[in-house]
């Protein structure tokens, strides 16, 4: 289920392409839920800027896939189907996991908080009915910026940081994980 970094497109995605890609992802999610009436993990990489598919985002994605699969194994949860693909919005993973949706969401939140790359992952859990379990459902604060303690959404809207600084921070986190062989 890993993606080969050397095949990254480096395509600068436009806002209309990004919106279409998100609609397509939502349609894929609903199709998966019809095939497998168990919770669905929909996994993407948080990638600031217009280039969503790069060697860096694919390597970050691959670490996330490994961590999600290890989590399912550790918890004794069966992965019924899994797939990886690349859309205009970057690498995407989907895993149908036979587990209580609430437990799955709590475990993925913990993974996002405990893994050195967790801040770069966007892990959604959808119930078999198609409802997305949100961080807000668990009274968790919004995601923090990669560079400061502000909300990531506030910094993104205000364009507080240079894109190059954000991308350099992403790559530094990835290189640290690779150097330590963290999965």
From Swiss-Prot:
EC class: transferase
Pfam families xrefs: CitX (PF03802)
Record-level GO BP terms: prosthetic group biosynthetic process
Protein's UniProt keywords contain Disulfide bond: no
InterPro entries for the chain: CitX
Biological function: Transfers 2-(5''-triphosphoribosyl)-3'-dephosphocoenzyme-A on a serine residue to the apo-acyl carrier protein (gamma chain) of the citrate lyase to yield holo-acyl carrier protein.
Protein name: Apo-citrate lyase phosphoribosyl-dephospho-CoA transferase
Source organism of the structure: Escherichia coli O1:K1 / APEC
Gene symbol of the encoding locus: citX
């Amino acid at each position: 289920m890993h993606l080969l970094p050397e095949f990254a497109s480096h395509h600068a995605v436009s806002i209309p392409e990004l919106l279409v890609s998100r609609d397509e992802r939502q349609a894929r999610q609903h199709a998966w839920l019809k095939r497998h009436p168990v919770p669905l993990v929909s996994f993407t990489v948080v990638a600031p800027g217009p280039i969503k598919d790069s060697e860096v985002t694919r390597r970050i994605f691959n670490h996330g896939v490994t961590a999600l699969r290890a989590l399912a194994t550790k918890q004794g949860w069966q992965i019924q189907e899994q797939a990886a693909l690349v859309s205009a919005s970057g690498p995407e993973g989907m895993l149908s996991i036979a587990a209580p949706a609430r437990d799955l969401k709590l475990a993925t939140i913990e993974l996002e908080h405990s893994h050195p790359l967790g801040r770069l992952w966007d892990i959604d859990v959808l119930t078999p009915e198609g409802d997305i379990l949100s961080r807000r459902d668990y009274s968790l604060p919004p995601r923090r910026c990669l560079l400061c303690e502000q909300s990531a959404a506030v910094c993104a809207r205000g364009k507080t940081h240079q894109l190059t600084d954000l991308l350099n921070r992403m790559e530094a986190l990835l290189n640290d994980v690779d150097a330590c062989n963290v999965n």
